[in-house]
C-alpha cells in the first residue's frame, strides 16, 4: 500500500489493482477489489475470488454469485444497493482456502473498505470472513446470530458456494438473509428514538 491513505473507495481500488504484497499477484489475472454502492448500509464480505471473478474483476460473478443475487432478491434487497467484497482481493490457485499470510496482506484494504463504506450491517459469507471479527467462535455455532462489532451489526451466514455443494444449507441461507431488513429497520428505529428522546444531546465526534 502507498504511503498515503486513500480517501475514497475508488482510490483504494486503484491501489489494490497495483498490489504486489503477496505471491497471489504472480498468478492472478485481475484483482477483485469490490463492487456495489460505496455508501451502502449493507456490506457483504466473502472469502476470495474464484475463476469467474479473476476474469471479470467483479466479486461473486459465478454460480455462487447467482445464488447470492437470489438470496438478496428474496430479502427485497437490490444488489446495486449493497457493497460486496472479499477477504482476499486476488484468486488463490485452484480456489484453495486463503492462507493466513494472504489474509494479513489484504487486511489493511478490507479495514479501509469498512471504514470508507461505513455500513450499518456486515454480512459475513463463510468462516474466514466471520473469523476476522470473531476469531474465538466458530461459524457453525454462530450462524444467523447477530453480534455487535464497533457499532456495526455482524450477521454470519454460510457462504453461498457451500449451498451449491450441500443444497440442504440453502433454506438456512434464505432464513438468515431475511434478517437483514429487520436489522436495518431496528437500526433506523433506534436512531429515530435517540433523536426523539435525547434532543439536547450533542454528538461527541471524538468518541
Feature map (PLM): residue ranges:
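Active-site and ligand/interface coordination hotspots across diverse enzymes
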Residues: 1-63, 196-207
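Glycine/proline-rich loop-helix segments at beta-alpha junctions forming the active-site rim
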Residues: 2, 10, 17, 75, ...
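Short acidic-hydrophobic sequence patches enriched in Asp/Glu that either
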Residues: 8, 60-67, 102, 172
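Short, mixed-charge, low-aromatic patches
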Residues: 22-29, 62-68, 130-139
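A sequence-composition feature that detects small, non-aromatic residues
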Residues: 25, 40, 48, 61-64, ...
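Short N-terminal helix-initiation segments at or just after the protein's N-terminus
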Residues: 29-32, 66-68, 99-104
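Glycine-rich, small/polar surface segments that engage phosphate groups of diverse ligands
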Residues: 52-83
Amino acid at each position: 500500500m502507498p504511503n498515503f491513505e486513500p480517501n475514497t473507495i475508488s482510490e483504494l481500488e486503484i491501489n489494490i489493482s497495483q498490489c504486489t504484497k503477496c505471491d497471489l499477484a504472480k498468478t492472478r489475472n485481475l484483482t477483485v477489489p469490490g463492487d456495489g454502492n460505496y455508501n451502502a448500509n449493507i456490506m457483504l464480505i466473502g472469502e476470495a475470488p474464484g475463476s469467474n471473478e479473476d476474469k471479470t474483476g467483479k466479486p461473486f460473478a459465478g454460480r455462487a454469485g447467482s445464488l447470492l443475487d437470489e438470496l438478496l432478491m428474496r430479502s427485497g434487497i437490490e444488489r446495486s444497493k449493497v457493497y460486496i467484497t472479499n477477504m482476499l482481493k486476488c484468486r488463490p490457485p485452484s480456489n484453495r482456502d486463503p492462507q493466513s499470510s494472504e489474509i494479513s496482506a489484504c487486511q489493511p484494504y478490507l479495514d479501509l473498505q469498512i471504514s470508507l463504506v461505513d455500513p450499518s450491517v456486515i454480512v459475513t459469507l463463510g468462516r474466514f470472513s466471520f473469523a476476522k471479527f470473531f476469531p474465538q467462535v466458530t461459524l457453525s455455532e454462530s450462524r444467523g446470530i447477530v453480534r455487535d462489532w464497533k457499532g456495526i451489526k455482524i450477521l454470519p451466514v454460510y457462504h453461498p458456494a457451500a449451498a451449491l455443494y450441500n443444497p440442504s444449507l440453502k433454506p438456512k441461507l434464505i432464513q438468515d438473509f431475511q434478517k437483514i431488513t429487520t436489522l436495518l429497520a431496528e437500526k433506523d428505529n433506534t436512531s429515530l428514538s435517540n433523536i426523539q428522546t435525547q434532543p439536547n444531546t450533542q454528538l461527541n465526534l471524538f468518541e
